[in-house]
């Protein structure tokens, strides 16, 4: 991985030694080489708050030599990210999130859903049109604020992420049971309503998180809980 032995190439994939959970897959998408020699929170480019991102351009020069920053799994220029969960005998789920995977959250969207949550709908904002009702812009607000004091704020964000994702992984079981044995039309209706409701709940939760972080970290001060 360090490029010291170019003959010993890394495999394209590896077989896990034990069964992995959906949550482990989610979290693998958030990696910045933490705990390895390439840990991007530890080198000089991370600054005073352990920021694992390097702004463009990616290359830089020192003493006449050109260097290049690594590109981690999680990256700031993310429009959306997802993990597909194929489930035997059950409707698949697209776990869908907006913006940087390391500081955003996945919500369940059933694959037989027939409508899109308004907060995620095409046309609700764009790269040149900010709108308060857009999940893309809300998640960007929180994430870009966190980049200023990443070591502290990312921990606050991660608490909300883990709580939501673990809750949803359990919550979908009740919806699965509710859809079992119903007609295709009835299943689609339940799946669509559920997917939209949860996306809206997440949007509301992230709006509260946005305000919480501003209150806690305003003007460079750290308020007690």
What do these predicted ranges mean?
Residues 1-225:
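C-terminus-biased signal that marks the final domain/tail of proteins
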């Amino acid at each position: 991985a360090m490029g010291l032995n170019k003959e010993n190439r890394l495999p394209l994939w590896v077989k896990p030694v034990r069964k992995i959970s959906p949550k482990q897959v989610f979290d693998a998408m958030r990696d910045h080489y933490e705990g390895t020699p390439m840990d991007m929170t530890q080198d000089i480019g991370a600054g005073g708050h352990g920021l694992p991102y390097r702004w463009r351009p990616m290359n830089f020069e020192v003493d006449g030599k050109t260097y290049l920053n690594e590109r981690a799994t999680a990256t700031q220029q993310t429009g959306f990210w997802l993990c597909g969960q194929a489930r035997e005998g059950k409707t698949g789920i697209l776990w869908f999130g907006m913006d940087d995977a390391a500081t955003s959250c996945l919500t369940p969207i059933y694959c037989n859903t027939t409508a899109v949550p308004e907060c995620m709908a095409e046309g609700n904002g764009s790269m040149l049109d900010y709108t308060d009702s857009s999940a893309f812009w809300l998640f960007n607000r929180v994430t870009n604020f966190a980049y200023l004091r990443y070591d502290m704020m990312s921990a606050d964000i991660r608490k909300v992420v883990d709580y939501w994702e673990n809750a949803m992984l359990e919550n979908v079981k009740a919806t699965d049971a509710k859809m079992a044995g119903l007609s295709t039309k009835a299943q689609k209706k339940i799946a669509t309503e559920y997917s939209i409701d949860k996306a809206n709940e997440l949007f509301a939760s992230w709006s509260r998180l946005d305000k919480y972080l501003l209150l806690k970290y305003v003007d460079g001060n750290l308020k007690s809980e």
